[in-house]
Amino acid sequence: KKGLAPLQANSFISSVALRHSRDMLSGRTPFGHDGFHERIDRIRKHLGPIRVAAENVASGPMSAREVVDGWLHSPGHRRNIEGNFKLTGIGLARRGDGMIYFTQIFTR
């Protein structure tokens, strides 16, 4: 819609996003963006230069569709989704009670 190329899924970025979701689920890191710069540094070491990066996180007993709908109704999250990024990775971690932690990382 915005004249941008489609995002390309990247398995390494997804592994970094998954680790963050698991860390939030386990309580090793609080819910949110703590450690964002370290995650981007890890991606940079593996993939090379990154000019810009962003991250969306969510938690709750909800579907991926509900998470994306929520992000699209939040100006900051929507800006990331519609941003001029090239690569993305998504990771989610689920607890036995149905609570799910979602992380999506965007890079260019």
PLM features per residue range, with description:
Residues K1-R108:
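Functional surface patches built around histidine and acidic residues
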